[in-house]
Amino acid sequence: MTSKTDLKGKIVYANDDFLKYAGYTMGEVLNKPHNIVRHEEMPKTVFKYLWDYMKEGKEIFAYVKNKTKDNNYYWVFANVTPSIDVNNNIIGYYSVRRMPNKSAISTIESLYSDLLRAEQQGLNKGVEMLKNFCKDADKTYNELIFSLQEAK
């Protein structure tokens, strides 16, 4: 599943798999904010990490719960990278999403539930909680997420 966005997160490309899983047509998503598929149970903390990494020109991995047009959902393991022009300027973002490791979803659901509760006291509380979660695992955010994907 693939999509591309501009610098502001508006969809400029979505492949057929993206459209099929999300239940939209190209006309319904083109030039719309990518958060058209964001499920309300996704913590803002995860997207803060995502945007912070990408603005620094770094790739990021994330488990994302997406919402379909008919209000169902599906989980993906996303890899998001900045798109760079010939002058090394970030001109947009490219996301490739794969099937997530099913055994990781329960861990992620629990973490995301905790993050959502923490965010009720402010986004900084969610960020602090995620930093501590990574620290306790002795991994960077990307290492943690990737290790969950690789776990048996």
Where does each model-flagged region fall?
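PAS-family sensory modules
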Residues: M1-D6, V96-K152
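Sensory/regulatory domains in signal-transduction proteins
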Residues: M1-L115
